[in-house]
Amino acid sequence: MLRHPYVLAMTVGILFSVGADVGFSVAIPEYLKNVYKVDLNRAGMGPTVYFVAKTIAAFLGAVVFAKVSAAKCFPWCMGVGLAATAAIPLVGTPLAFLVCVFIVALMTANSFGMCMGLAIDRVPEKTNEITALMVMAIVGGGLVSALLGVAQRAFGAVGIVGVLLVCIAYLLALGLFAQKRA
């Protein structure tokens, strides 16, 4: 299946989607503590904001994707998610940071489903194989976590944001790629 360029691109998309998801959920409290000097108890609420937005996005995605194709939504969602991620180092308050986090989660929450759905739509006769491949890509998302650790040690909080930007930028490029092939 990895010989099929479209399926390969979507598989890498799953890897970056999972990596960004895990990265954000782990990095949010650290970022709040290190950049904004928020105490540990309050910083622990950051992931709650992230997961509330992801939950809302999952429900909205079920409604939106019943009416609009994932190929049309994918680049728009990732573009807004990328912009919100890029804004993180520029905002000056914990509240503004959490607003950015909420927007990122809202926009990127359905990236896994979009990658998988688009790959299956492209090669429907290989649904089982694609599904197995995508599940394996979930494990690969752990590679991004390792990169986050390296980036944090080398560049601090900005390094974390840099790795997350790369993940979401790939997803944006993937969305544009999918839109052109739809």
Residue ranges and their predicted role:
Residues 72-87:
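Structural signature of the two symmetry-related core transmembrane helices
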